[in-house]
Amino acid sequence: IYFIDITDHTNDELKKVIMNYYYKEKIEYVFYDTLKTDIDNIGNGEELKKTATILSNLAQNFDMYIGSTLQLAETSTDPINLSVNDMAVSRTVKEVLDTLCLFKPIHTENLGNYQYSLNETDEEVYELEKFKDPDVRYYSCVVDKNRAGAKPKLLFRLNLAYNRWEELGYLRLKQQNAHTSIKD
């Protein structure tokens, strides 16, 4: 695992760094936090799309995985209802992405509004457990774009102390008179 600080970069420099590691270290996975425009185009949303296109082309041409994070805007959108409109950056970047997953925490006071199932169509659902440990949190993951198929709404439990993510199942809003069961 290599960590490289390339905070201030041009698109050419970013491409060069990735390709150097690809050829020298045989990397297959790149995680880029946080996707941003090159240093000469800060604040220009269309330039962000160019950066994303460069990364997408590298991934396709060299058979590697490139994942990145994007910031969400500060909105009051319910975690299960996130969409591309909640992104802080240009929404046009979605056009070049193969997959877009939007994550947002579910606040403890709202846990009772949600339930989850192990399979998307299951009728048996489970409650979200409240934890005393503040490092344990739930996140909604809305798959906004997926060229490979389905676009589910997923539930993850995160333990910040151990940086452990666990996919629990398919998230849904509670229904009136819904059948619930208690998970062992």
For each feature predicted by the language model, list its residue ranges.
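C-terminal regions of RecA-like/P-loop NTPase motor modules
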Residues: 2, 11-30, 54, 60-62, ...
